[in-house]
Amino acid sequence: MKQLWKRLFPIGLATLSLCMIPSCGNQSTPTNERDNTFESPILSGESDTPDITPDVDTPSQAESATNSGDLLAPEPPVESSEASAPVDQDEDRPDGRNWSSVFAMPTADEINAYQNQSTHRAPYITGWLSIPGDTRYTEYVVDFKADLLPDGTYCCLGNWQMDYSYLERQYTSVRTEYSGVSGYAGFQSLGDGTRVSIMSFWDVYCTDADGSVTTIRAQRVYPEVTDQTEDFSGEGTGAHCIVPYNWKAGYWYQMHLKCGVSQSTGNTIVEQWVYDYATGESTLLCAYDLGAPNVCFKGASAFFLENFLEPLSGEVRTMEVRTPAYLDADTQEWYAIASAEMHSEGGLPQYEGSYNFGADSECFWMITSGVGGDWYGNGTGQQGGTFSIG
């Protein structure tokens, strides 16, 4: 894990997927120092290097829970040799995992035959990172890669709950559409081949003592203009931002979510960044004002691999996740997350096919296809459980 952690901080639409929300599971984690080279145009104010002191209330000692993560000794960030110059991402793609050693790969004919009559989606695999439920954190990072990346794929890297205790002190009840899920973020390959990032926040419903309900919807503050529809519905209501980002199969990236304070409203802002290990470039993708101050992430966060287009469900898709970590809001220490509860979601009639998932010394991994019969609960596919890396 320490060797991987040296890589963790070298930096500081045809079709939209409204995915099934995974059911909740449980987390631990990096270093107490890092070189913050993400220069935020939203949060920086007058400073070139933004102060990311968390915009959250610090609880009393009695309210603070003991963090079960393993605190790692600080290690200085190192420059990646691959990041010294851009690479030709077609000719120089690195070798990937030997997927055929863990999965019965369907032939092209089998895939085509299945997709000609498919009305189902391929299996849907989730991993809930082992962050204690009462842990509050202001930043979250995770590395990801998809060796096999057909259209109709969503690699979700974060599916989280927000700590709305500030609002809970003012209202009788505060809820989102899905218990324990306030937002998610990740990367997609759309039906026309366009590659994008996405970040979504569900509406927050606040009920006061006389029964009046106030709805708080996150407001996009970056980018200023987007071609995609801001609002969503179908699986609850809220706001999302979809940004073109040409992420490529077979390459490692890092997604970084960070909370800060809006200079204009005083509310919490959440930014979504991506770092490309091959080119050494970091990019601010989008940012949302959450409509309330003193908000941060809380408890478990999930990653999942989804096929959201039935006509492409036979294709083989993969995802690998490594070095997930969070910045604890109370201790201001980074913690590395070494385990996740991984399992398949759903079942017939919506999902069918074959799948496998697991973990090794470096990362969590998952692979799916609509071809085959290892669907959820018939006992022939990989059974869910706790998997560890490092």
Q: Which residues does each PLM region occupy?
A:
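Flexible glycan-contacting loops in extracellular carbohydrate-active proteins
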Residues: 289-315
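Secretory/extracellular carbohydrate-interaction modules
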Residues: 110-225, 386-390
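Carbohydrate-binding surfaces in secreted/extracellular proteins
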Residues: 247-283
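Short, aromatic/His-centered strand-loop micro-motif at the edge of beta-sheets
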Residues: 232-252
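C-terminal motif of bacterial Sec signal peptides marking the signal peptidase cleavage site
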Residues: 20-23
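Bacterial signal peptide processing site
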Residues: 25-27
